[in-house]
């Protein structure tokens, strides 16, 4: 009896240690509050035990200082950070920048000593005031002239966090989001240098294909497809991860991005296989209302009456219905990605975004909130 109890306790301990060994970084987007009806998502919908880190997107920069973006950001900050009352181990970060912020604004701030210093000095008190545990830098697609300025910004921001913590507070975390395209990485990021000063790097391995290609294709393949052209050999998570590691990113700081959204296309002919021509992005979703993008919960609705397929080589699914072609991730594909990153001994997984998963658990017929994120968590925990 005693041996059985001891063995059970050991198994539980191993599972807990396994789960604790991997980060599950989850982004929440503040604009999801504006979606209609059941698509509207606020931070109190988040399970505080689901992710190890939740990143609030995005903060703004005004007069070279970090600032709110939405009119009710302060209220939402408080709602998010209240989750830590239920799970004190949860870490929250505030992401600054993003696609709409643009690279040029970052460039102007980071390229001048005084403006860079003003920005850096503004960050710790802002994070402390609003209850965050760290900052996520989402300077996306910096130009080649920006590479050294980004490195300096990261280095000086980390130094400020170290200095600020000397007062006895827990040191603030510093992370960065990095696009996964080889050209973007080469142009704007000194990976070996910035890795030294970051707690983790979120690799955005989910934007490899889009309507700009004028053909169908998957935006988040795990591996290269057998029919991929040589020009597409870099456009998969496996290559991006391997390339980042070769450039000097430590595996224990690299987090692989997994999307909870799909990309949709409008077919230009009856062809639906790889390379089929398109006339443009797919029709907007009922809630997200953006051409070419669908939340997972919208995809669950689309799948009713659709024909589903799977790229066996790329290990990701797609579906067709009428003239609509949708690439997406499901529980099988996200589990495969989680197993992959474990095999590569990476730091963990990143999810973009919680509000694009079936966060209510009412759309996908499983009676489970956050089915994709939970599937990732289960694999990371060894379940």
Swiss-Prot record:
Family statement: Belongs to the glycosyl hydrolase 18 family.
Name the UniProt record assigns to this protein: Chitinase-3-like protein 1
Functional summary from the UniProt entry: Carbohydrate-binding lectin with a preference for chitin. Has no chitinase activity. May play a role in tissue remodeling and in the capacity of cells to respond to and cope with changes in their environment. Plays a role in T-helper cell type 2 (Th2) inflammatory response and IL-13-induced inflammation, regulating allergen sensitization, inflammatory cell apoptosis, dendritic cell accumulation and M2 macrophage differentiation. Facilitates invasion of pathogenic enteric bacteria into colonic mucosa and lymphoid organs.
Signal peptide, first to last residue: 1-21
Annotated compartments: Secreted, Extracellular space; Cytoplasm; Cytoplasm, Perinuclear region; Endoplasmic reticulum
Gene Ontology molecular functions: carbohydrate binding; chitin binding
Self-association and partners: Monomer.
Gene of this entry: CHI3L1
Organism the protein comes from: Bubalus bubalis
Domain called GH18: residue spans: 22-383
């Amino acid at each position: 009896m005693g041996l059985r109890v001891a063995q059970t306790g050991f198994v539980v301990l191993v599972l807990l240690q396994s789960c604790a060994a991997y980060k599950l970084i989850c982004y929440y987007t503040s604009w999801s509050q504006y979606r209609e009806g059941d698509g509207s998502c606020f931070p109190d919908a988040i399970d505080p035990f689901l992710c190890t880190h939740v990143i609030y997107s995005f903060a703004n920069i005004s007069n070279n200082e970090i600032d709110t973006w939405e009119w009710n950001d302060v209220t939402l900050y408080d709602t998010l950070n209240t989750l830590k009352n239920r799970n004190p181990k949860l870490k929250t970060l505030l992401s600054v920048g993003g696609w709409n912020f643009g690279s040029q604004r970052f460039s102007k701030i980071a390229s001048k000593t005084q403006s860079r210093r003003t920005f850096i000095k503004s960050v710790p008190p802002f994070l402390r005031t609003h209850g965050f545990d760290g900052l996520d830098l989402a300077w996306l697609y910096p130009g080649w002239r920006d590479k050294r300025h980004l490195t300096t910004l990261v280095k000086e921001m980390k130094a400020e966090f170290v200095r600020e913590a000397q007062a006895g507070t827990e040191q603030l975390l510093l992370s960065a989001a990095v696009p996964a395209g080889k050209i973007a990485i080469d142009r704007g990021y000194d990976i070996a240098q910035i890795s030294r000063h970051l707690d983790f790097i979120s690799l955005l391995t989910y934007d490899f294909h889009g309507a700009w290609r004028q053909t169908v294709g998957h935006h988040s393949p795990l591996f290269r497809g057998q029919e991929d052209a040589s020009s597409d050999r870099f456009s998969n998570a496996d290559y991006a991860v391997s390339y980042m590691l070769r450039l000097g990113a430590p595996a224990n700081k690299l987090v692989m991005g997994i999307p909870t959204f799909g990309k949709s296309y409008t077919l230009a002919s009856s062809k639906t296989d790889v390379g089929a021509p398109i006339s443009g992005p797919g029709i907007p979703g009922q809630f997200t209302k953006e051409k070419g993008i669908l939340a997972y919960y919208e995809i669950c609705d689309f799948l009713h009456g659709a024909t589903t397929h799977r790229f066996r080589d790329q290990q990701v699914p797609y579906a067709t219905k009428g003239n609509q072609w949708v690439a997406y991730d499901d529980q099988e594909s996200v589990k495969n990605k989680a197993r992959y990153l474990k095999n590569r001994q990476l730091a963990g997984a990143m999810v973009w975004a919680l509000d694009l998963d079936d966060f209510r658990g009412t759309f996908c017929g499983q009676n489970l909130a956050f089915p994709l994120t939970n599937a990732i968590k289960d694999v990371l925990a060894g379940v």
